[in-house]
């Protein structure tokens, strides 16, 4: 993701003393019985998404709880089987909860973030596109490529500024697609994961 977009978050600014503690922390967690997955080309969110997908596919697992408030993890939610938990707000979001919060379903979350951006990950989205406009348009069309090129073709009731939004999208569609790619989690991770691997029991 850093190679795709220069503004994407990185470890810059992290004190060297903290960086030096990471291997020590990994060893301590492993010794305590926790599963540790050191990664170079992937991030923690990819690992969470991959683990959730593996657990979802295992019939022995009753429910998958993804414990993070990060917006991009919303794409992993499925029905009430794979849910997202924000422990600060004590809020559990199933698929209906994701729709209520963002105005779009889990499959459209990367497209949504491609339009509005994600400040936590360091990409801005498109100018003029906010949460309301993105959710209104994507609730109808689902994905960036399915949005008609001309605002006159849009069937989005009550949307203001459609012409300007459409012009911005058409002129910066490649950028929106790039941001969507950044927001899309790798939930396969080379097929290396199993429930037995991700379990600390």
Predicted ranges, named:
Residues 14, 34-35, 60, 89-201:
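Non-catalytic nucleic-acid-binding/docking modules located in mid-to-C-terminal regions
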Residues 1-67, 72-83, 87-92, 175-178, ...:
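Noncatalytic, basic helical substrate-engagement surface that gates or grips nucleic-acid strands
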């Amino acid at each position: 993701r850093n190679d795709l977009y220069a503004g994407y978050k990185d470890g810059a600014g992290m004190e060297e003393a903290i960086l030096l503690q990471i291997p020590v922390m990994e060893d301590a967690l492993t010794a305590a019985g926790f599963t540790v997955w050191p990664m170079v080309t992937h991030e923690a969110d990819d690992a969470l998404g991959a683990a959730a997908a593996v657990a979802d596919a295992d019939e022995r697992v009753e429910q998958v709880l993804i414990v993070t408030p990060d917006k991009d993890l919303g794409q992993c939610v499925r029905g009430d089987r794979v849910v997202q938990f924000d422990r600060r707000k004590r809020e559990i979001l199933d698929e209906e909860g994701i729709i209520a919060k963002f105005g779009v379903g889990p499959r459209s979350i990367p497209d949504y973030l491609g339009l509005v951006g994600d400040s936590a990950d360091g990409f801005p989205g498109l100018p003029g596109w906010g949460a309301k406009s993105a959710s209104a348009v994507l609730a109808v069309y689902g994905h960036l490529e399915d949005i008609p090129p001309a605002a006159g073709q849009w069937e989005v009731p009550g949307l203001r500024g459609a012409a300007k939004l459409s012009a911005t999208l058409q002129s910066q569609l490649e950028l929106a697609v790039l941001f969507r790619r950044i927001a899309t989690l790798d939930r396969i991770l080379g097929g290396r994961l199993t429930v037995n691997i991700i379990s600390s029991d």
